[in-house]
UniProtKB/Swiss-Prot annotation:
Presence of keyword S-adenosyl-L-methionine: no
Protein's UniProt name: Molybdenum cofactor biosynthesis bifunctional protein
Segments for region (Molybdenum cofactor biosynthesis protein C): 1-145
Similarity section: In the N-terminal section; belongs to the MoaC family. In the C-terminal section; belongs to the MoaB/Mog family.
Pathway(s) it belongs to: Cofactor biosynthesis; molybdopterin biosynthesis
Annotated binding of substrate, by residue: L61, C62, H63, M99, E100
Purpose of the protein: Catalyzes the conversion of (8S)-3',8-cyclo-7,8-dihydroguanosine 5'-triphosphate to cyclic pyranopterin monophosphate (cPMP).
Species of provenance: Synechococcus elongatus (strain ATCC 33912 / PCC 7942 / FACHB-805) (Anacystis nidulans R2)
Keywords: Lyase, Molybdenum cofactor biosynthesis
GO molecular function terms noted in the UniProt entry: cyclic pyranopterin monophosphate synthase activity
Active-site residues from the entry: D114
Amino acid sequence: MIDVGDKAVTERTARAEGWIRLAPEVYQRVTQGQLPKGDGFLLAQVAGIQGAKRTADLLPLCHPLPIEGVKIDCQPLADSQTIRVEARVRTTGKTGVEMEALAAVSAALLCLYDLTKMFDATAEIGGIGLLEKTGGKSGHWQRPAIAPDVAPTGALAGVFATVITVSDRVAADQAEDRSGPLIQNWLTDQAATIATATCVADEPALIQAAIQAAIAQGSALILLTGGTGLGPRDRTPEAIADLGAIPVPGIGEALRQAGRSETVMTWLSRSGGWMLEGSFVIALPGSSRAVSSGLAMLQPLLPHSLAILKGADHGTVKG
């Protein structure tokens, strides 16, 4: 059994589906509530909930989790004489609930088969699969086959952002910048507009000039990567603070918490967040892996944070 002790505790969700195809007369019995054993949809929902809760008992290497929510939907599809079952499972933990969602769908479908087999044992179960999951290091995943033709509006639509890589070696063309492009791709996925992406050496004056230029260009979000460690030239946090920026302590705490699943060295990082002239300035570590985990942590926080920085009332902002 995999040790998940070092993984970060995050909110995790999963959504799965499956279907059962019935003979026409059996389909009619189910949809009209004419089964001798009771309401087929209600019993399938109960079975699905039980399936999610007992997943760790069925699968030997699956971690037992404190399930916080299970929702089972049964959708009759008259054209194909099928019942589509969808399960949504939610928890806050160190590992995902994909198997719980799949187990819930399977249990609900098996319950429907059990309720109807006396009329027709040839009912067919199929299409069981994961639709979507969120949480953890990998963030949001959606099964490609069901991805919408038009991408939904990203969480940072309309936000102007700047990416600043802080590295002596990258600035001198002695190393490849991996974290900067990673942040840019993430911002693009969130529908943000990238005003500038630049690289500067580990010089406080250069860091400050890049930040001030970003603010002058109207960037509401300024993401820096690098210069947050214990090295003699790691001075990104000091450069930001010396501009008169107001610290947001929880950001650094959350970034280190998110990175602890990657390495214990995350506790040596001095990454953090600041408010400066109406912009949100966030200093991420230089490691691309730490950047990935940090961005996953920031994703649900940024829309609310940026709205509040613009003067929105707390009660009118979701999240």
